[in-house]
Amino acid sequence: MKITVYQKPSCTTCREVYKALEESGVDFTAVDYYVDPLSKHKLEKLLKKMGMKAPELLRKKEEIYKTLGLDKKNLSEEECVDLMVRHPDLIQRPIVEKGQKAILARPAERLKEIL
């Protein structure tokens, strides 16, 4: 079954997951979502496959989170998704998708859950 990793190549955890997949000989596709942005529909599908709500996927320590004053707002599911689509830095990473399941592979050891 095809595996897709949604990542930011400069992210340490993303590089760990990439290396682990390469070393295990697993066939996978890496998607840099800064170059190939996630659509709202795709992000919603990934959230559903992960069993997560959008606020759980927000990177709350990112500068943009504070700059936009998001720490002072009670955001809806749709608002969070829209923000992550517009500002990919707000997306926790890496996300690993395999068939009807996806995980947030943070820490990288979580990768075992999907292989």
Enumerate the language-model features and the residues they cover.
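Local sequence-structure signature of Cys/Sec-based thiol-disulfide redox active-site neighborhoods
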Residues: 1-24, 28-33
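Thiol/selenol-based redox catalytic cores and closely related redox-interacting motifs
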Residues: 35-115
